[in-house]
Amino acid sequence: MLFFAVLSVLAVAPAISLLSETQVRYLGHAEVADTIRLFTGSGLPGSEITDESAWDAWIRDQDQQVRARIDRGVEDSISNLILYGTSYTKLPRLESTDKALAATGEVSRAARVRVHALAVALDIASPGERVRFVREFLTLKGIAKQGREQFLAANLRRFTEEQRGYQQKLEEAGKAPDAAEVLLTRGTLYQTRGLSVDTSLLPNYALEDTLRVMAAKGAIAAGKIKRIAVIGPGLDFTDKRDGYDFYPLQTIQPFAVMEAVLRLGLGKPEGLEIVTLDLNPAVNAHVAQVAKNARAGMAY
């Protein structure tokens, strides 16, 4: 895996350097008019806007909403770290999200002591990278040192209540006689949830299987893949399923897809380039640092 990882990082580097030379700005209506006109009458948000001023207001509002969901996703990951993390405390992990709240609806004692443990870890001069990530995030949000523990506890309560709400909706949908209603519920359940940076390994296997089938059918010729775009590579902080945090912060998907392409003979190491696109600036910063380290001869 290391060989392919180094190759991947080297391939990322040119794309990162190009991005650093561009100017980030909002698109004007004139620049997107031809595209959104294709969706007139479709109900797609923003597709009915024809005025430059209205478009500018709408796209800025969308940007604020997305950034708010990114922050909420980080807050969700922090709650998972509190529930299951072992890198900052020796306290036993909680069995599940439900154990975070007592019957009264307040944060349970077992959860409170873990909240306190993380708050204490935040004061350490040289904490682990996840704790440092949390501290920097709270600082950016303007959370004062003396208010950290209260914020973490309130956020954990909010997170747990949301998880219970999702489960309740799924259970109610499961009782419906219409299978389409169940699918609709599952498909829209997380439409407003925070955008977490954590990923799953499973899509990587599915992608490799798909590439293998396409190659077998002749849809992709050997050695023809030269550029790969990974939308939402993510950053494994503490996963939603088990909350493991014993490994360094890492992004796997860019390396997994490139390794699959090389292993299947669909691309050549010397001619493969990968570009990553993510809404979360922390993910983009991580990938940029990976590329910088690679140029300095450091493996990932």
Which residues does each predicted region cover?
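Bacterial N-terminal signal peptides
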Residues: L2-A11
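Conserved alpha-helix/loop element of class I SAM-dependent methyltransferases that forms part
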Residues: L201-I225, A256
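Class I SAM-dependent methyltransferase core
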Residues: I228-V230
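Class I SAM-dependent transferase core
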Residues: L183-D198
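Extended charged low-complexity segments that act as oligomerization/scaffolding linkers
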Residues: I16-S17
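Class I S-adenosyl-L-methionine-dependent methyltransferase module
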Residues: S20-V182, A222-I225, G234-Y300
